[in-house]
Amino acid sequence: YYASYQPYFSDKTAFIPLPIDLREVTSRVRSVPEKLNFFIGIQSARSNLKGTDVMLPVLQEVRRKYSELCRVTEVHDVPYARYQQLMDDADVQLDQLYSYTPSMNSLLAMAKGVTVVGGGEPENYEILNETELRPIINVLPDEQDIYQKLEDIVLHKERIPELSAQSIEYVAKYHDHVKVARQYLDFWKKH
């Protein structure tokens, strides 16, 4: 929304990241997995909005080709608490194909040290003035691009520890709920 409103209401808009309460998250930098565990959560009523209807068949194709190197944890319509538990063993989470930025689910995954495949466009980093951290494996809404990015992480799973550590650092740096609350208060006081 920021990108849409900023040109017209520049004095009334500010980009403030989504908050994550890091006290409620157990972070763990992932090691190089023997078998890469992909996690995809599917809400049947929203699959086409989140892009999981496009990502899942591509992920299944990668799993078929590299069954000795990866597995898939596929979760359908579970309560949020159960979703979080099932995500704990993941190395890589797929979410929000059409987004420019990570979703709340992706941020939660990143806070846990899970690498995210999804919305991580250059604009996401530019709006934060982030020039070094690049924890998100950005994918385009294109089956070939998704396949190439998934295949690449399967064949180069040695990247997982670095991406995992960057994910934790990214969320702590930009999405800590206390820092986000301060940004809201600062903006409110100025206006």
Name each model feature, range by range.
Residues E158-K189:
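A charged, aromatic-enriched C-terminal amphipathic alpha-helix characteristic of glycosyltransferases
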Residues F38, L56-Q84:
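A conserved nucleotide-sugar
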